[in-house]
Amino acid sequence: MKVLVLITLAVLGAMFVWTSAAELEERGSDQRDSPAWVKSMERIFQSEERACREWLGGCSKDADCCAHLECRKKWPYHCVWDWTVRK
């Protein structure tokens, strides 16, 4: 019984390795180095431009700042916390 379980586990392990290798071969290793793949990764990690200014970002009015921030009334004008904590 123990031998049968060990043989079954060995066969399942071999099948896993074989299917993983076949899948890798199907995709191709050069796909990871292709310019299209690099461009898609750049697009994913590209910083998004926000419609509002973050903390200490320059502003001219309160609407320029993100939620829970307001534009400082005196020079230098930048976004500061408005002392609110609600969502």
UniProtKB/Swiss-Prot annotation:
It is found in: Secreted. Its main location: secreted. Transmembrane segments: none annotated. Expressed by the venom gland. Residues 1-21 form the signal peptide. GO terms for molecular function: ion channel inhibitor activity; potassium channel regulator activity; sodium channel regulator activity; toxin activity. GO terms for cellular component: extracellular region. The keyword Disulfide bond applies. Pfam families: Toxin_12. It comes from the Eukaryota. Keywords: Disulfide bond, Ion channel impairing toxin, Knottin, Neurotoxin, Pharmaceutical, Potassium channel impairing toxin, Secreted, Signal, Toxin, Voltage-gated potassium channel impairing toxin, Voltage-gated sodium channel impairing toxin. Disulfide bonds join C52-C66, C59-C71, C65-C79. The keyword Signal applies. Belongs to the neurotoxin 10 (Hwtx-1) family. 39 (Jztx-34) subfamily. The presence of a 'disulfide through disulfide knot' structurally defines this protein as a knottin. Negative results: does not inhibit TTX-resistant sodium currents on rat dorsal root ganglion (DRG) neurons. Has no activity on voltage-gated potassium channel Kv2.1/KCNB1 expressed in frog oocytes. Does not show activity towards Nav1.1/SCN1A, Nav1.2/SCN2A, Nav1.4/SCN4A, Nav1.5/SCN5A, Nav1.6/SCN8A, Nav1.8/SCN10A sodium channel. This is Mu-theraphotoxin-Cg1a. It comes from Chilobrachys guangxiensis. The lineage of its organism: Eukaryota, Metazoa, Ecdysozoa, Arthropoda, Chelicerata.
